[in-house]
Amino acid sequence: MGRREEMIAKIKELMLQPERIRNIGIAAHIDHGKTTLSDNLLAGAGMISEELAGKQLVLDFDEQEQARGITINAANVSMVHNYEGKDYLINLIDTPGHVDFGGDVTRAMRAIDGVIIVVDAVEGVMPQTETVVRQALREYVKPVLFINKVDRLIRELKLTPQQMMERFSKIIMDVNRLIQRYAPEEYKKQWMVKVEDGSVAFGSAYYNWALSVPFMKRTGVKFNEIIDLTLKGDHKTLRQKAPLHVVVLDMVVKHLPNPIEAQKYRIPHLWQGDINSDVGQAMLNCDPKGKMVMVVTKIIIDKHAGEVATGRVWSGTVKSGQEVYLINTKRKARIQQVGIYMGPERINMEAVPAGNIVAVTGLRDAMAGETVAEEPIEPFEALHYVSEPVVTVAIEAKNVKDLPRLIEALRQLAKEDPTLHVKIDEETGQHLLSGMGELHLEVKLYKLKKDWGIDIDVSEPIVVYRESITKPSPMVEGKSPNRHNRFYIVVEPMPDEIYNAIKEGIIPEGRIKNPKEVAKKLAELGMDYEIARGIVDVYNGNMFLDNTKGVQYLNEVMDLLIDGFHQAMDEGPLAKEPVMKVIVRLIDAQVHEDNVHRGPAQIYPAIRTAIHCAMMKSNPVLYEPYQKVIINIPYEYMGAVSREITQRRGQLVDMKQEGEVMTIIAEAPVAEMFGFAGAIRSATSGRALWSTEHAGFKRVPNELAQQIIRQIRQRKGLDPNPPTEKDVCPLF
């Protein structure tokens, strides 16, 4: 039996023993060495050859990732590790560190129970580190810490052991501060990382060595020996004395939970259904004999197998030929092939039980985040994405005959990556693709050209603005065209506390199932409890409340009212841009008794016009997306960089100096950031290292707002003059 067959046999055996499984991820700031770490773990576990690891970047198997040297898609690999005489199956999901791909990180967190946080010893904890730690803890994922690139402290910065220890302590303190801030109450203390118990390891993923206190105690290897070998450049001996994969995977097995342990506390948090039901108990106990439930975390399109859905099996067993329900899309499907991962390749299996990461084909309508089950159940909570699409490009096929394929290609892209939004502009016939940043869209468009071979014209990137209001409106009446239905509403600006609670997932998006509980939370955030009890729907950071008393037939049209509310929020009155931070309250209504007179054609315009008219009476304003920019540069380029930022309406938020290196943190409007990459490169002769992340929305200065509204309206083929209250409010 060859090495490969042995490995497959071992994986088959271990996947049936959930206490021997660890589902983990690696998360870090861009370029802190995450993919190099995962490759060297794979090599150590015998999945790829050692010489290639680190240079090979197995997980970056998309040619774009290898060209750009960053990880774009979270891929999954499995490996076997022996700890204290027992074999363990470790499923490792690699996640991107670049902010434009934050959606992948969020989805991967759903499938894993533990995460290795990688921090560069030279740079320390960075903004993106904070983002990934927050995402992990929000999904109840337990962290351990790997401090990487320690060789640079020894060789480049020439620090003494004492200085290095100080550097490590600071990083550990910073990470623990994040855990303290974001971990669930009951785990704030328990999940702190400590050098003494081995939940912290440090080393060099590139040179393939690592140390932890338990490893040093067990083997007698001293830190000073490692320093000497590093200074001599004897990497081979280093690798043999302190092999990276042994130290890191030992830490994983010892400190990160198996699926049986993890599901006990994760399921009640991630799943909204009844924990005491049969399926609830099966998931709590990770029971392979229960009803099958899995959550899809990623869809990839494979040239041979078609759509492959990767996901986590929470209970039961996934078998080929099984008939399943896709809960969110409300469709049935039949599972065709079932497999698990070995390295990056999929190995077909007959069946895969609870606690594993599975790859299946046959779920044609599934999207990432879909709950797949043997029978209809409550879906898992919606995935929370950290940022939202802020940049749009318009796409047209150069050749008209490619149009049907372009539509199909865009549909597939949006399925693979739910953080992409695809919209067809009915008026111009253009396809609008919105993403989380310039790089995100660039990568997706490259994929579209390469995988589908379609020639396309792409517009300059356009920023997605938001519309909002600054004061409460008076009561406004909306009438249906047949005048038989009337709705009386007011709109109010949403307080920041409530908006942030929605963004952090404390207040759920979508139709509200348990208004009393949500009202309690809203009351804690300062809303009047009596008003809050009327909460019906939360949509893209806006809220719809029913504060009527005893209106007949209102329930019959509530779904239509919510649809109309969504339409009004998708396109605001100023420039048809999405609306944010608006609370719409229905105060009173008259609804016709005969449902012929209260269909969509009557209700939609009534509620939509009323909301837009009320917004025009509430001092409507435009918001624009901002980016946080983190730049590392040699000290002498300080002036050039701050000029570059202030020219772009940006502000410096913070500056830190370590040795010769300055770290500048700034915020600037996305609209001004196009072409920043080239500008910063020439301003610093290519010496700047920089990354960006979404920094929310800020109000557009008044002197620019009118001009921007005109530009947006012109681009959309509307009358360029900004509308007045008279234009929007009907003359009833």
UniProtKB/Swiss-Prot annotation:
Compartment(s): Cytoplasm
Binding-site list for GTP: 28-35, 94-98, 148-151
SMART domains (alphabetical): EFG_C (SM00838), EFG_IV (SM00889)
Job description of the protein: Catalyzes the GTP-dependent ribosomal translocation step during translation elongation. During this step, the ribosome changes from the pre-translocational (PRE) to the post-translocational (POST) state as the newly formed A-site-bound peptidyl-tRNA and P-site-bound deacylated tRNA move to the P and E sites, respectively. Catalyzes the coordinated movement of the two tRNA molecules, the mRNA and conformational changes in the ribosome.
Protein name: Elongation factor 2
Species the sequence originates in: Pyrococcus abyssi (strain GE5 / Orsay)
Presence of keyword Membrane: no
Gene, per the UniProt record: fusA
Modified residues (Diphthamide): 597
Family annotation (InterPro entries): EFG_II (IPR041095), EFG_III/V (IPR035647), EFG_V-like (IPR000640), EFTu-like_2 (IPR004161), G_TR_CS (IPR031157), P-loop_NTPase (IPR027417), Ribosomal_Su5_D2-typ_SF (IPR020568), Ribsml_uS5_D2-typ_fold_subgr (IPR014721)
PROSITE patterns: G_TR_1, G_TR_2
GO MF term set: GTP binding; GTPase activity; translation elongation factor activity
Residues annotated as domain tr-type G: 19-260
